[in-house]
Every structure is written in structure tokens, then in C-alpha cells.
Amino acid sequence: MQKRESKYVIVARIAYRLCQRVVAPYSHLKSPHRFTQPQLLACVLLMFYVRKSYRDMEEWLLASDAVIKELELKEIPDHSTLNRTFKRFRIKLLEKLQRTLLDELQPNELGIVFDTTGFSPTQASVHYLARCGRKYDHFYKGGYAVGIESQLILASMSGQGPGADTGFLEPLRRKARRYGLRGKWMVLADSGFDAITIRLGDLIPPIRRGGVMKLPERIERMELVSAAKLDGYFGQRWKVETVNSVIKRKFGDEIRSRNLFRRYREPIVKGLIYNIHV
């Protein structure tokens, strides 16, 4: 009887091989050579996948022989080592890891759906916050571009809310366009993305400011969206809502880091490990 392989082992293997392709083994010639950079990066990605703290991840690795074998670790990295590794994570590195993975999978999409979702700035429960009377007037946002066919995250970025999603439109478009059908792909999004940078063919419902629509191009776009709704194509937007739900259920709906710069990295990390997961 064939033994079933753990999902954790599969994720560790994909993350480790991905990091090996992108990152050099050591940061400098006189590195201690106890761990390679790909090993440590893969451990941090796996830490977010299993939703463990730095200290708990150290203990989890001690009990996970199959994962240790997959990562080729000769010893277990200390929790402080994992912390320093995530500190070295830069958004450019995360985006390079994402591009490398997607270039291997080669998605080619006709429709790409944009959406944002909010992440709590604290790990405290809603009950605790209600009892102590503490309120937060902001949250962190992850903006994701999801392919309709592949349901992969083709582009991701982070920001802070509350606020309009219009600022996410063009950055997501620039990052995702390499995975769209040349000259044919289109953007699907809700009216929160209704910005002046909208292009011809974008399926984004215009906002009725004052209840009346006067500009011909906005009326034309409203008719285009209405036709797409009748055809059922605009209904494919639900796929990005599913992706948002998976990210929050599997990897948490909160931001764990206390450092401001690392807080903005976490929504992008969650997008990367989602692609590794699926």
C-alpha cells in the first residue's frame, strides 16, 4: 500500500526548490555555513503556512523529521534566526519568488479579477477588543489579481485601509499583464476600482455619483458590464472572493508583525504561499 505524502512535506519541497532558484546559497563568503539562505527562507514561508510563531516553529521543526529531510537541514534553526530571516525579506524578493513560480506554471488568462481584502492589525480576538474597549481606526489591505482559469494569484500588493481601491488598479495591472492573453485579456473588478485610469474593455461598474450617469464613456461601460452580467461572465468575480477566503482561513486574517515594514510584507507573503499551496 502506497503511503500518502503529507501536504506539509509537499509545500516544504516546493518552497525550498523555489528559493534555491532565486536566492544564492550564502549571503557572503565568510558566512557560518550552518544554514543556506534557501533553507531559512523556506522555513519562514512554511511558518506562515502552518500559522506558527517563531518559537513554536522551532519546536514544530524539531518534531517534523520528514520536513527536515526535505529541507536538507542538519540542525534546527533557532527562533531568533527565523526572525532575522524574515527581517531580510524584501518585497522585491517576494515578488521575484512569485514571478519565478508563475513563470514555471505558465498561466495564460483571458480574464483577471482584481480585489482587495482587509487584515486585522492585531491578533487579539474580537471579544477581547470589545471587553477592553480598544478600537482600531485602520487595517492592512492585500490587493490580489487572480486568474479566472487557473485561480492563481498573478499579482499582489499591500496597503492600508480604510480607503478606496483605485490606487491598486494600475500597479496590479502592470504586474499581472504578463500572464494575460496578448491583446485580449480584460480586467474584472467591483466599483471600488472605478478610477480615471480605467481602460477600454475593463469590466468595472462605474459609480453613480449623484445618482446620474452623464458621460458617454461611463454609460457605455455600464452597458458593457450589464451585458457581461447577463452572459454570466462577470459572475466569475466570485473566484477572487474564494481566494480571499482561503487565504484568511488557511493563513490567518491578522497581521502578526509589530514592525511597520514587515506588516506590509505579510499580505504579499500570504499571496505567495497561497500559490505554493494550490
Model regions and ranges:
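Basic, short loop/linker segments at the boundary and entry of helix-turn-helix/winged-helix-like folds
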Residues: Q2-Y49
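Short, hydrophobic/amphipathic alpha-helical patches that form generic packing surfaces
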Residues: L40-V50, P267-V278
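Catalytic-loop motifs flanking and including active-site residues across diverse enzymes
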Residues: T36-A42, F168, K239, V243, ...
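Polybasic low-complexity intrinsically disordered regions
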Residues: P32-H33, Y49, N83-R199, R208, ...
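Helix-centered, glycine/charged polyanion-binding patches within enzymatic domains
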Residues: M186, S191-R249, D253
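Short helix-capping/linker segments at secondary-structure and domain boundaries
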Residues: V50-D56, F251-I255, I276-V278
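Short, positively charged, Gly/Tyr-enriched micro-motifs
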Residues: P32-L97
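Short, solvent-exposed helix-loop connector elements
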Residues: Y26-L29, A130-R131, L224-Q236, R249-P267
